[in-house]
């Protein structure tokens, strides 16, 4: 790995491979044998399940995983990780609601981003907005089905 930025309190398990210019935000967890493609971003408080390939940006507060080395998909909200980091039930519900609204919306990606700009300001919303509103050339990792 070269020119990577790894945030505070981030856990990289054994055999994690980061290509160049990867950005991992604070409090993220990457399990064993995760491979991250160059120029990808991993959001705060997210968890990547073992033995998968991250080829798109992974949103904050999410769990992403694949099967036997396959592409990572969002599987849900990292509720246990948020509880362990001291988030209140209201904050966890807020993250869950905002991520469901974003990923389950049938509007275009640009319209979803416009809606995201309108949500109120608080710690959780700001982390989500700051990540998702930042330009990406890689796309955002998404669920295989609705959250």
Segments from the language model and where they lie:
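Short, amphipathic C-terminal "tail helix"
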Residues: 117-147
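Right-handed parallel beta-helix/beta-solenoid
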Residues: 1-4, 17-19
């Amino acid at each position: 790995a070269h020119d990577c930025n790894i945030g505070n309190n981030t856990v990289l398990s054994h055999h994690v491979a980061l290509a160049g210019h990867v950005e991992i935000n604070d409090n993220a967890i990457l399990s064993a044998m995760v491979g991250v493609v160059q120029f990808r971003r991993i959001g705060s408080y997210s968890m990547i399940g073992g033995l998968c390939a991250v080829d798109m940006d992974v949103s904050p507060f999410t769990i992403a995983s694949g099967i036997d080395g396959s592409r990572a998909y969002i599987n849900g909200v990292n509720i246990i990780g948020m509880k362990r980091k001291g988030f209140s039930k209201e904050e966890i519900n807020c993250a869950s609601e905002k991520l469901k609204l974003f990923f389950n919306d049938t509007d275009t990606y640009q319209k979803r981003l416009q809606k995201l700009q309108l949500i109120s300001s608080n710690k959780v919303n700001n982390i989500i907005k700051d990540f998702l509103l930042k330009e990406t050339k890689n796309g955002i990792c998404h669920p295989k089905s609705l959250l």
